[in-house]
Amino acid sequence: MAVTSSDLVLYASANMPLNDNNTSGGAINSGIRVTFTDPSSAAQLIIFSSSASDTSQTLALKGRNAAGSIITESMSLDGTTNVTSSNTFERVLIAELSDVGVGNITVSGNGVNQIAEIPIGENGFLRPFYDATTSASSSKTLYEKIFVKNNNTSSTLDGATLIPVAATGLASQITYGIEDGKASPQSVSNRTTAPTGVDAFGSGASGVYPNGTGVLTAYDYQGFWLKMSLEANESAINSFYEIQVSGTTS
């Protein structure tokens, strides 16, 4: 079966720090995705499962309210019944299940758009560069690692290429560099430390290892580092970063 867009998933690394002090990077975390949609407006969140058996899990949420303050909440699943959050979220930063679902878990805004679906066997989703802040007197550069994985059970993606979406969100402040090797567990001491063994950081399209001409076989994955550049005393912004994956398959 040919590779489809739903087979190509962006996953987190094992260490996605909540500050500038903890380890960043590491091996792939195939339970946490880094793709989801922001609420179209601030709203309470609704969660439910496609399976009535999902009644023991909790979903731990971190996000921001309309004032920009970080808020947290733990929501208990009730099978296929809608459960509504107490808090109103302007955006979600992290959503993580206490245990994987028997069914797919949907996270939506109350009266607004669907935010994400957590597939069976996975734990949640997150936004890289959690609570990143600028320095009052100097610029700052942060590095966090994510992966692109081909979840197709049998087919290969040839000419696998990462393509940032220009002129949207934080495209002017984030570049990326592909690791010199697949499935690398490389980490750095904190997210202010630059990784080694990475192609030059840039904002253009780039193929996966080796030398930008590689392939992603079934269940294969490639790590790449995001580099975010912040100016001194830069104002807070509610934004996003988009990157696409392309290739050919048969």
Task: Set out the residue ranges of the language-model regions.
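Surface-exposed interaction patch
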Residues: 136-195
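Beta-strand-rich interaction surfaces with strong enrichment in secreted/lumenal proteins
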Residues: 131-134, 198, 210-216
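Intrinsically disordered, low-complexity Pro/Gly/Ser/Thr-rich segments with frequent PxxP/GP/PP motifs
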Residues: 182-184, 203-234
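Short, solvent-exposed loop/turn segments enriched in Ser/Thr/Gly
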Residues: 25-26, 138-145, 220-224, 235-242
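Noncatalytic modules at the cell exterior or secretory-pathway interfaces
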Residues: 42-46, 86-102, 221-226
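Beta-sheet-dominated interaction scaffolds and their linkers
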Residues: 5-30, 123-151, 155, 162
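Autoprocessing Asn-cyclization modules and mimics
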Residues: 14-64
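Serine/threonine-enriched low-complexity regions used as flexible
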Residues: 228-250
